[in-house]
Amino acid sequence: MAQILAASPTCQMRVPKHSSVIASSSKLWSSVVLKQKKQSNNKVRGFRVLALQSDNSTVNRVETLLNLDTKPYSDRIIAEYIWIGGSGIDLRSKSRTIEKPVEDPSELPKWNYDGSSTGQAPGEDSEVILYPQAIFRDPFRGGNNILVICDTWTPAGEPIPTNKRAKAAEIFSNKKVSGEVPWFGIEQEYTLLQQNVKWPLGWPVGAFPGPQGPYYCGVGADKIWGRDISDAHYKACLYAGINISGTNGEVMPGQWEFQVGPSVGIDAGDHVWCARYLLERITEQAGVVLTLDPKPIEGDWNGAGCHTNYSTKSMREEGGFEVIKKAILNLSLRHKEHISAYGEGNERRLTGKHETASIDQFSWGVANRGCSIRVGRDTEAKGKGYLEDRRPASNMDPYIVTSLLAETTLLWEPTLEAEALAAQKLSLNV
């Protein structure tokens, strides 16, 4: 149903009886009638909204084409190649036709793009090569069409600087790591902004809602804004084959979270990046801006993180709590390395307030959300389980964070002296 905004002066327009606008079928009809009453000159010109109903309208025709199912007529499919852009957080994509449905990334051709237009290559040598790495079903086009997560390489076969997947894949392929079957559960927080003013969804423009408290997991038109986007994203992820495990409204109004996992090794990064892509596309269609800024609003408002839950096979087995404590000890000794890799602008979020630890001080605790590393009460009670790294920012790269956790806890060995000092400082009896 399209709409026409009509000015107030008296006017009447009738579509001729035999006009081409009129569909021959009795099912289809179209008429435009604009009528206004005379108003005195001293009155403001008013407007009336009148409906233009037409199954043959431009909008309907475009929607019909968008919803076309090509499967009965062709084996060819559309593959949307997706990659990470020059900022390390922006996503890019483009489409190509593939002759038949595929089941594995190895069946797909490599492709290329203009890296000088994404900040990833100089103009005189701009070609960057896309290597297909993971396939997901396309919830926007349906059918056998697919989304393809790619990483980025030079023509000579070297990963470009923004390709963090390559190093992560190398770490996860190490037998010491793969043998421990590392699981990751990633909690992606994000904030929805009004398109034209870049202010949180549901907030009065240039002003603030009531203080935090009623919004976390809240219900009601005065507490929650953006649920349709969250739900649409949830279903799109399930359709795509992403291992999404839940969603919830967050502490700051206009902020949401989705969880991915548990996923093994490199899959965690692939699934989070594809989930982010779907969210970007859905907010694009909704006319809402998505931001992963770790502190979108200064002041007494929660920031946005990407808490990462982590366990290994040894942690999940009997006696695993001792393995968890050893992992925490290692993480404490590489705190600076992790912080430097955990997202841009994280110093604005990790202040020691709003359920965060100080960025300058490593800490751990049971059920304590003000620590760097949190251990759940179930894990403590059972003597096995997982740990939660609460330091990563919402704009972190999941390839970096997951592989660094595996590297620090499974491949890196501190000196005995450093280990003893750290254990004493953290009250860890390892």
Swiss-Prot record:
Keywords: ATP-binding, Chloroplast, Ligase, Mitochondrion, Nucleotide-binding, Phosphoprotein, Plastid, Transit peptide. GO terms for cellular component: apoplast; chloroplast; chloroplast envelope; chloroplast stroma; chloroplast thylakoid membrane; cytosolic ribosome; mitochondrion; plastid. Transmembrane segments: none annotated. GO terms for molecular function: ATP binding; glutamine synthetase activity; mRNA binding; salicylic acid binding. Its EC number is 6.3.1.2. It is an enzyme of class 6 (ligase). The light-modulated chloroplast/mitochondrial enzyme, encoded by a nuclear gene and expressed primarily in leaves, is responsible for the reassimilation of the ammonia generated by photorespiration. Homooctamer. This is Glutamine synthetase, chloroplastic/mitochondrial. It comes from Arabidopsis thaliana. The gene is GLN2.
